[in-house]
């Protein structure tokens, strides 16, 4: 089912309730919502009109918009049935990890302070 929920403050909770994130866009820049969905552990299905730079995990598929509806449906169903770990260690080990980000920021501030 598709539901338009309007402006929300509880997006993280909504992602946790989803099985799959689907973005069949005709045009996109870099969709932050697609990045958020991946970092929530969701498998993501994007149209081929979404730039590949949005891919941060191995749970992303790009599907041509001109593919048959049935092909899209089969890909979404397969992604929903895939119950592999949504925690995704590759995210935990990435530069987006909070501990690594904090270390990078601390090092940056130390570098700035050393110039004073």
Question: What is the predicted function of each stretch?
Answer:
Residues 1-6:
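Nucleotide-activated donor-binding/catalytic signature segment of Leloir-type glycosyltransferases, i.e.
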Residues 7, 26:
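Aromatic "clamp/platform" in nucleotide-sugar-dependent glycosyltransferases that forms part
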Residues 11-14, 28-31, 38:
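Short glycine/acidic-rich beta->alpha loop that forms part of the nucleotide-sugar donor binding site
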Residues 18:
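An anion/phosphate-binding loop that grips the pyrophosphate of nucleotide cofactors and donors
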Residues 21-22:
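A short hydrophobic beta-strand element within the catalytic core of glycosyltransferases
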Residues 34, 43-47, 52:
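Short hydrophobic beta-strand element within catalytic cores of glycosyltransferases
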Residues 83-116:
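A charged, aromatic-enriched C-terminal amphipathic alpha-helix characteristic of glycosyltransferases
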